[in-house]
Amino acid sequence: MAKRTKKVGVVGKYGTRYGASLRKQVKKMEITQHGTYTCSFCGKDAVRRSSVGIWKCNGCRKVLAGGAWTMSTAAGATVRSTIRRLRELNN
């Protein structure tokens, strides 16, 4: 096989199209999108994206809702902390 690309990585499929800065943004997004994440239920590094905003753990078969390109978003973290604070106030 021929030697693969070193600099551009996953966005080599776009060639010289769309401009360098847009390809850098897409590269960052696609790396986080196609990576694996740690499951908060079983602890395995087996969570993969199955579709937009839906993440599935291949270890314990749990299905999680998350962001479109990353498993957790800043808005989701804010909501979780607010829920935790409200639960502490009720108890």
Swiss-Prot record:
* Keywords, ordered alphabetically: Metal-binding, Ribonucleoprotein, Ribosomal protein, Zinc, Zinc-finger
Q: Which Pfam families match?
A: Ribosomal_L37ae
Q: Which domain of life is it from?
A: Eukaryota
Keyword Flavoprotein listed: no
ZnF segments: C4-type: 39-60
GO cellular component annotations of the record: cytosolic ribosome; ribonucleoprotein complex
User: One biological-process term from Gene Ontology?
Assistant: translation
The GO terms describing molecular function are: structural constituent of ribosome; zinc ion binding
Give the protein family.
Belongs to the eukaryotic ribosomal protein eL43 family.
PANTHER family cross-referenced by the UniProt entry: 60S RIBOSOMAL PROTEIN L37A, LARGE RIBOSOMAL SUBUNIT PROTEIN EL43
- What this protein is called in its record is Large ribosomal subunit protein eL43
Q: Which gene encodes it?
A: rpl37A
